[in-house]
Design a protein with these regions (language model features):
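N-terminal Rossmann/SDR dinucleotide-binding element
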Residues: 2-72
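Catalytic nucleophile serine of serine hydrolases
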Residues: 12, 85, 119-121
């Protein structure tokens, strides 16, 4: 880690909301670790205090990743596409639940006490 400031982990940090969150965390001086497959987001923030892991949340292994344990986790990685959710509602809901459970497990692995989970409009399909 490049700073003495706490590390904040953000899933979906390349999406619209996630990238704005990353910018705000950087403005406050935090080091930010982003896990995002970058399929639906294109808001990649080039900054010396951001470390990117380009992968699906379900394929990220916190045991093998060389990241500083985060002091907080913001989980924003969910299926954002309404059209796809309407076509494949079970797959969408299953994916959103599975990714949230996986990231909650990261909080346990990292002994992280602050875990914030959000969702997308696809939860209402």
């Amino acid at each position: 880690m490049l700073t003495d400031m706490p590390n904040i982990l953000v899933t979906g940090g390349c999406g619209f909301i996630g990238s704005h969150l990353v910018e705000k965390l950087l403005d406050q001086g935090f080091f930010v670790t982003v896990v995002d497959d970058n399929r639906s987001g294109s808001h990649y923030i080039e900054h010396e205090m951001v470390e990117y892991h380009k992968c699906d949340v379900m394929h990220f292994n916190p045991h093998h990743a060389s990241i500083e344990p985060p002091s907080a986790i913001f989980h924003l990685a969910n299926s954002p596409r309404i059209r796809r959710a309407l076509e494949f509602p079970t797959e969408t809901i299953t994916n959103n639940i599975a990714t949230t459970c996986a990231v909650a497990d990261w909080a346990r692995i990292f002994n992280c006490k602050l875990f914030f989970a959000t969702s997308s409009s696809t939860q209402y399909v």
